[in-house]
Design a protein with these regions (language model features):
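Structural signature of nuclease core domains in nucleic-acid processing machines
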Residues: 1-83
Length: 83
């Protein structure tokens, strides 16, 4: 996991090819209750943007950078994608 932007995302998956490649950034959060899961996802997406995790990959030339937030509470999981 390499550092990007102003910190380090939890998980980054990227293709070897840059010009035709893609990057997926995942930020993970633990929620205290099922009711808090959506807010945890929103915090994770805000962190991705605030810390500029995608910028190094865009600068490197990756045409597609997708950003996802995942929140967990016990055995439940919620996923939100950045627009």
């Amino acid at each position: 996991n390499r550092e990007s932007g102003n910190g380090r995302p939890d998980i980054v998956m990227q293709t070897v090819q840059v010009r035709k490649g893609r990057v997926i950034i995942l930020e993970l959060k633990i929620a205290g209750s099922i009711a808090e899961m959506e807010a945890a996802c929103d915090r994770a997406l805000a962190q991705i943007e605030a810390q500029h995790y995608a910028e190094p990959f865009i600068t490197e030339g990756y045409p597609e950078v997708k950003k996802y937030a995942l929140s967990f509470c016990k055995k439940e999981c919620m996923v939100k994608k950045a627009e």
